[in-house]
Amino acid sequence: MNRLLSSGMSAATLQTRMASQLLINDSKYGFLKELGLTENNAGVFHGKWAASGQVVQSFAPANNSPIANVQNGNVQDYEIAISEAKKAYNDWCEVPAPRRGEIVRQIGDKLRTQLQNLGKLVSLEMGKISAEGVGEVQEYVDICDYATGLSRSLEGKIFPSERPGHALLEQWNPLGVVGVISAFNFPCAVYGWNNALALVTGNSVVWKPAPSTPLTAIAVTKLVEEVLVANNVNPALCSLVCGEGDVGQALVKDKRVNLVSFTGSSEIGKIVGQQVQARFGKLLLELGGNNAIIVNEDADLNMVVPATVFAAVGTAGQRCTTTRRLIVHDKVYDQVLERLKKAYAQFESRIGCPLDSNTIIGPLHNQQAVGKYKASVAEAVASGGKIEYGGKVLERDGNFVLPTIVTGLKHDSPVVLRETFAPILYVLKFSTLEEAIAINNEVDQGLSSSLFTTNIQNVFKWMGPKGSDCGIVNVNIPTSGAEIGGAFGGEKETGGGRESGSDSWRQYMRRSTCTINYSKELPLAQGIKFE
């Protein structure tokens, strides 16, 4: 900028030129302004929109063009946000749960009104195709519906007391402030899972989104703000601080944050876990996944191939549940591989702009991801692997790569055991189901897995104590595409956290065991006499 000014260009002219380069000023992206976004956006909300950190730009992975400017928050902004969120909690926790559920229902309805626009923003800023972008927003809508019903069924158990004239029961209460640190690959849904359940269980929320997807976070927060204000609820209940690692560090180490929900890599998750545990805070970790599909000899191959393609190349291989290993019985290995290569070849012409309805594979999120893709392909080849399809970076604007199939590697090759966040599929052989299960379980993570079989004995072996060690254990469906009704999460270095359905709501509450003596006597437990 200084160089341009010194060349004689005025500051006003320079600002005009820079503004014209922003995608938000291109009529093609009119949905951005319909979501309330502008050229310059405050990345902090704590009841008011304000920020005092560095001004950054959000970029579109499809062409690496700047979308709009965002002024990040800093630690001082975070301090205001956490203070205001704590104040909002003090009122919200006393609102009856069904009323909280009604407000969450309205959030879902508000999201419905902007479903297409918000889905397009997710696609533009993250890089996933339009169908997946809209589907991600739909997940937030669905979890709002789920949480609304949950608001009338949050339950604690009543137990028989061994003492006469006594009642023994559980009482569940909100935790306080829930801190949500979300990842770039699901910039809307991960917050939605946490936000809906945290609100309905009586908590306030402070959201620190991924640094590369701030516009989605700002647009979502604007919609939530409208609902809270319309219901005379302190809008700081859902606070937002866009920023870098200093903001995340402040949140993780802050004793005022009762639960930290972190979605990201296992490496960073380990650090987050240690820091939160050091202050005896509560944790919800959703980390990496080196997921596998097992294809048994009796599998329906007409189901296997489309399921594998969806799970391996959907979101350009950037889901935590992406299939990265395909473990195929040696009797059907050649047949599966040939079908898979043909399927991949059909999609090559449909790699492109995620907002194009014909596109089925979008870009990687940034150039760093492209670099990791190239490094993993090179390592696979150096380790004796054969590139059956792909293995190349596409020479065009944006961060596009060919989805890749690799064969010929040992199942315990370092590159196979390591999660690469890109569309690289390692195809492996096995002879017995026990061998395949062992291969599935040998990686450090334990998120998602699937077995394709028509043998009911195999199904229950797979689901049992000597089967998959993952948190998600599927049969005859892909590893990705989980429904919101079940608990989502994994074991080992995936972190052990559970979000979304089932009893995941319990992680956002504290449990008290209450013994009530309604008699006029004072008997002690276990028949103890203390006289």
Swiss-Prot record:
The organism's place on the tree of life at top rank: Eukaryota
Transition state stabilizer (site feature) positions: 185
CDD domains found in the cross-reference section: ALDH_F7_AASADH
Binding site residues for NAD(+): 264-269
GO molecular function, one term: aldehyde dehydrogenase (NAD+) activity
E.C. number(s) listed in UniProt: 1.2.1.3
Biological processes, Gene Ontology terms: aldehyde metabolic process
Active site positions: 286, 320
Keyword set, alphabetical order: NAD, Oxidoreductase
Key word Nucleotidyltransferase present: no
Catalytic activities: an aldehyde + NAD(+) + H2O = a carboxylate + NADH + 2 H(+)
Signal peptide extent: none
Pfam family, one: Aldedh
Complexes and interactors: Homotetramer.
Family: Belongs to the aldehyde dehydrogenase family.
Protein name: Putative aldehyde dehydrogenase family 7 member A1 homolog
Species this chain originates from: Caenorhabditis elegans
Gene coding for it: alh-9
